[in-house]
Amino acid sequence: MRLTGLRFFLSYESFGVSSPFDPACRLVTSPFFSPLTLGALRLLLAVYSLVTTITVLVFESVRYHDASGFLSYFTDLSYIGLVAYFWASSTQTIVFALRGQKSYPLQSWPRILQLLHVLLYSTITVFPIIVTVVFWAILASSSTFSTRYSAWSNVSQHAMNSIFVLFEILLTNAGPSPWSHIIPCFVPLACYLGVAYITHATQGFYTYSFLDPSTEHGLLAAYIIGIAVGYCVVFAIVRGICTLRCRVVSRYRRDSSEQVPSEAIDEWEHIDSEQPKESTGSEA
């Protein structure tokens, strides 16, 4: 039984990658928009986020000659995650619409790519919210809106990022993320702490002032623990909102054949209730 349990918790199914993958096509549908409209909206967000990323990188390179630390900021890294997700999801959704809403490419791709996609979804529904909260609660200052560029870039990367996330959480059939994602998605956040101190060692500056032990002293540990706890809280809240959205939409569906959200809950939450069955054979 122990071996059976270990196999289950290390399986793709335990991380929300069912076989067949996403039979309800929840990742490419919405309770409010047609697949083609959803694909177009996701493509719009993909284009905007990509243009924002390129503009910020080019502007900082040309105007401030300070692009060397671009990938050292969690804001930029999480925003790149948004770019990747919206380009991937918009492509899958548009192809799904063009195929007559029968299937989409990711369903036939290797399972490792399916796993990476659902993990990416889980990260982009949590990290941008953390970025927004930390920036406006701790980092924002009088210089935030000092110039047009500063105002636009800060609003785009520290406010609109969460609006994009809310679009996915509230207006699509995706999610809720399984609890098994909470640790894998926390790993990049934890590893970023190392990136921040490597940046200080190699380039001589702290990406975020609250990570400087010489000025924050004991508060540094409190900030780190607070962000870790905040991550868990945001993950749980987002998961709860997605579950509630699925149940509410399912309840008010007029056509029972369209109850995609209900199927989504069954598929994404099966690991919470499914227990490995005890072997009746010779399996140890």
Task: Report each predicted region and the residues it spans.
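Membrane-interface transmembrane-helix boundary segments in multi-pass integral membrane proteins
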Residues: 33-37, 203-239, 258-264
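Non-transmembrane, juxtamembrane loop and terminal tail segments
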Residues: 1-28, 103-106, 251-284
